[in-house]
Amino acid sequence: MQIHNRKQTGFTIVELLIVIVIIGILAAITIVAYNGIQNRASDTAVQSDLRQFASKVAEFHAINGRYPTGPNSTAAVEGIPKFRLAQGSYSTNMHNFYYCVGIVGGIEKFAIGAVSLSGKKFAYYSDNGLQIYTGVWAASAQNCPGLLPTVDPYTYGYGHNATTGWNSWTQ
């Protein structure tokens, strides 16, 4: 009778645990990188919307010699009945995408402000272009004095209401 001693091959529990830990670390790194990419994509989409809307406002100004007035409500901004926003890129737990117009130092100016899904705030100014907005983001029309320090009166419009959602002109 012959007895064969065969050594069993396979992975030990320690080796399997090491592999599982390494996979977990790689997954965590991937998730963090993916979130960063998503945030940058949202920021870029919001900035693009601000530039495009500012272009529409400038076009209105070139034709009419003044900036369009805001409706002071959820209605569309004068002369811009529809404007499709990249809605998935915006924070929706607050009023968002503000257009403000008023007189500053005797000169008519406008500002557009928005908060990205990443939480970054951006503003486009008629005299300074696109910038990161560092002011406080408030509720309702209180954003306009921060975006555009005007003397009353000013008019405004906004695209998203925290309670009722996106206004029809933004779709």
Q: Language-model segments: what does each one mean?
A:
Residues 1-11:
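N-terminal leader/signal peptides at the extreme start of proteins
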Residues 14-33:
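Alpha-helical hydrophobic helix detector
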Residues 27, 33-36, 41, 110-116:
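Short, solvent-exposed linear motifs at loop/edge-of-secondary-structure regions
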Residues 34, 39-90:
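Conserved hydrophobic/amphipathic alpha-helical signal-anchor segments
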Residues 58-62, 96-102, 111-113, 119-125:
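Mobile, glycine-rich extracellular loop/lid and propeptide segments
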Residues 104-106:
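Solvent-exposed loop and beta-edge segments used for protein-protein assembly and interaction
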Residues 108-171:
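Short, surface-exposed interaction loops/tails
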